Curated annotation (Swiss-Prot):
The gene is ung. Belongs to the uracil-DNA glycosylase (UDG) superfamily. UNG family. Excises uracil residues from the DNA which can arise as a result of misincorporation of dUMP residues by DNA polymerase or due to deamination of cytosine. HAMAP family: UDG (MF_00148). The active site is at D67 (proton acceptor). It holds the Pfam family UDG. Its EC number is 3.2.2.27. This is Uracil-DNA glycosylase. GO terms for cellular component: cytoplasm. Signal peptide: none annotated. It comes from the Bacteria. Its main location: cytoplasm.
Length: 223
């Protein structure tokens, strides 16, 4: 089936788009957008924003989130990201805090992470849609099957990618990644409830830049 997505992704995911589970997923999601009167996030055109912001072969870092923010006007299709006019959520505040400490730089007070995506950071949630005010409302409808396959395809077809796995859900994806080809960084989720259990002080961002330099890749400006 036809999916509006960046051409290089269309090529690597075409088989997935034609599987029965994905067809059922699309049918369900279309019905949700049609019947829930603007209460499904992100807007339809932004569901695949992570893919459309970054060609497949340009990926350098993968950050795995959970499901989109469920507040109005927050989710923009990039994990942990919000539109520039929206207040920066607590988890992203902690991400910026860790960047400033780890890299000794000042971050831009802007929650739109498109600036990272265009440099090679693939910001993928395990679930790509959500109903307003209902976290995990689109769990187990097919998105996890799809995003697991995306992670496996990245691991198999690319090399020397940094995978940042924050929190139990993201860390459960470790088995999908080939540790002989990639750098896997694990710690707690940046949420205020768990950031002090390892995320703050993890130095993931400095480790990522060191790894990219080691493998002769252009480093990322995480400001």
């Amino acid at each position: 089936m036809k999916v509006k997505i960046e051409e290089s992704w269309k090529e690597v995911l075409n088989n997935e788009f034609n599987k029965e589970y994905f067809k059922k997923l699309v049918k369900f999601i279309k019905h949700e957008y049609k019947t829930k009167n603007g209460k499904i996030f992100p807007p339809p055109k932004l569901i695949f924003n992570a893919f459309n912001s970054l060609p497949f072969k340009d990926i350098k870092v993968v950050i795995i989130g959970q499901d989109p923010y469920h507040g109005k006007n927050q989710a923009n299709g990039l994990a942990f990201s919000v539109d520039s006019k929206i207040k920066i959520p607590p988890s992203l505040q902690n991400i910026f805090k860790e960047i400033e400490k780890s890299l000794k730089i000042k971050t831009i007070p802007n929650g739109d992470l498109k600036r990272w995506a265009i440099q090679g950071v693939f910001l993928i949630n395990t679930i790509l849609t959500v109903e307003e005010g209902k976290p995990s409302s689109h769990k187990a409808i097919g998105w996890e099957i799809f995003t697991d396959e995306v992670i496996k395809i990245i691991s198999k077809n690319l090399k020397n990618i940094v995978f940042m796995l924050w929190g139990n859900l993201a860390r459960s994806k470790k088995g999908l990644i080939d540790p002989t080809k990639h750098l896997i960084l694990e710690t707690s989720h940046p949420s205020p409830y768990s950031a002090n259990n390892g995320f703050l002080g993890s130095n993931h961002f400095s480790s990522a830049l060191d790894y990219l330099k080691k493998h002769n890749k252009n480093i990322i400006n995480f400001q």
